[in-house]
C-alpha cells in the first residue's frame, strides 16, 4: 500500500509522485485547491483529460493492467478509467522558465508567472485555461515542427486538433497532477484533494 509506505518515510526524503483525483477538477477548482494547501506543495505538472471513452464498452471498463511504482507497490492501471489519447497532455502551472516577451502578443498567456494571483482562484483558473489553449494552438500552428517529432504511426497535427475539439466540447479538466515534496506534505495534500491513486516516481534526499 503506497499510503502506508509513505508514512514510513522520513521528511528529509523528497518524493516525486503522480496523483489521481477521485473526480476530474475544473481549472478553477484546481486553483482553489492550491490555495487551500497550507504546505503549498509544488505541482510540477497538471494532466489534462483529452478523451473520454472506454475500450470495453460492454462493461464500461478497460482491460486491467498493472504496474509497480518505485516502492514496489502494485498499482492498478487503466481500471475503470477512460482511455486517454497518447501522448498525454498537460501543463506546468507555475509559470517558470525563460520566454521571449513578444510571444504573449501572438499567444495570450503563454507566460503565466506575471499574471498569477495569490488569492483569486477564479482568475488563476481562467489563466490556466487560456494558457493550455495557447499551448495547443502553438503546436497546431507549427505542423512542420510536429512532423519532426512524429513516429511512423503517429500524426501529431491530427492529434492536437482532436484535443482542441475535445476540450471545446467538454471543457478543460484535470484528472491528476505530478507533485514534489516531503512524504507528510504529499499525504496531507492527498487527504485535502480527494486523491484515490498515488504512483511514486522518484525518491531523493532533500538538501534542506
Protein language model annotation of sequence segments:
Residues 1-13, 24-31, 38-49:
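N-terminal, intrinsically disordered low-complexity tails/presequences enriched in Lys/Ser/Pro
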Residues 49-61, 203-208:
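Short proline/glycine- and acidic-rich turn/helix-capping motifs at secondary-structure junctions
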Residues 126-208:
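Extracytoplasmic/luminal low-complexity segments enriched in Pro/Gly and acidic/polar residues
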Residues 31-36, 40-41, 53-56, 86-88:
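Extended, H/D-rich, highly charged conserved domains that either
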Amino acid at each position: 500500500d503506497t499510503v502506508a509506505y509513505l508514512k514510513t518515510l522520513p521528511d528529509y526524503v523528497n518524493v516525486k509522485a503522480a496523483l489521481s483525483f477521485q473526480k476530474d477538477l475544473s481549472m478553477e477548482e484546481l486553483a482553489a485547491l492550491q490555495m487551500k494547501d497550507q504546505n503549498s506543495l509544488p505541482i510540477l505538472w497538471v494532466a489534462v483529460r483529452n478523451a473520454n471513452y472506454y475500450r470495453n464498452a460492454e462493461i464500461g471498463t478497460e482491460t486491467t493492467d498493472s504496474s509497480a511504482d518505485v516502492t514496489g507497490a502494485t498499482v492498478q492501471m487503466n481500471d475503470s478509467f477512460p482511455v486517454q489519447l497518447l501522448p498525454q497532455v498537460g501543463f506546468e502551472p507555475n509559470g517558470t522558465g525563460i520566454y521571449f516577451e513578444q510571444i504573449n502578443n501572438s499567444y495570450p498567456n503563454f507566460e503565466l508567472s506575471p499574471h498569477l494571483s495569490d488569492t483569486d482562484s477564479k482568475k488563476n483558473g481562467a489563466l490556466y485555461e487560456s494558457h493550455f489553449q495557447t499551448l495547443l494552438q502553438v503546436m497546431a500552428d507549427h505542423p512542420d515542427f510536429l512532423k519532426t517529432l512524429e513516429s511512423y504511426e503517429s500524426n501529431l497535427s491530427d492529434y492536437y486538433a482532436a484535443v482542441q475539439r475535445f476540450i471545446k466540447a467538454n471543457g478543460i479538466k484535470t484528472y491528476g497532477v505530478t507533485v514534489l515534496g516531503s512524504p507528510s506534505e504529499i499525504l496531507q495534500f492527498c487527504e485535502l484533494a480527494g486523491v484515490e491513486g498515488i504512483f511514486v516516481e522518484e525518491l531523493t534526499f532533500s538538501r534542506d
